[in-house]
Amino acid sequence: MKPGIHPDYREVVFQDMSNGFKFITRSTIQTRENIELDGKTYPLAKIEVSSESHSFYTGQQKIMDTAGRVEKFKNKFGVRANGKAK
């Protein structure tokens, strides 16, 4: 591999924002925040869903609020009163 063209592959803490679960893995993700864990400072990547909160792994149903997304879609791509798209 050519030196200087590849991103740093380092240990990063990923934090599930829905339940606070944290895990350390290696990644090239660029982050703005750091966190101290087990006496060592790591870059922090915040994620919405992990294996600790995803319904496939937990077996529990979770309702997601998509009303805002649906309204945004209808406003952007909805049909006008005359039947033609915007």
UniProtKB/Swiss-Prot annotation:
Gene Ontology MF annotations: structural constituent of ribosome
Gene Ontology CC entries for this record: ribonucleoprotein complex; ribosome
Keywords: Ribonucleoprotein, Ribosomal protein
NCBIfam families in UniProt: L31, PRK01678.1
Self-association and partners: Part of the 50S ribosomal subunit.
Name recorded for this polypeptide: Large ribosomal subunit protein bL31B
PANTHER family: 50S RIBOSOMAL PROTEIN L31, CHLOROPLASTIC, LARGE RIBOSOMAL SUBUNIT PROTEIN BL31C
SUPFAM superfamilies listed in its UniProt record: L28p-like (SSF143800)
Annotated InterPro entries: Ribosomal_bL28/bL31-like_sf (IPR034704), Ribosomal_bL31 (IPR002150), Ribosomal_bL31_B (IPR027493), Ribosomal_bL31_sf (IPR042105)
Gene behind the chain: rpmE2
GO BP terms, alphabetized: translation
Keyword ATP-binding: no
Family stated for the protein in its record: Belongs to the bacterial ribosomal protein bL31 family. Type B subfamily.
Organism: Burkholderia cenocepacia (strain ATCC BAA-245 / DSM 16553 / LMG 16656 / NCTC 13227 / J2315 / CF5610)
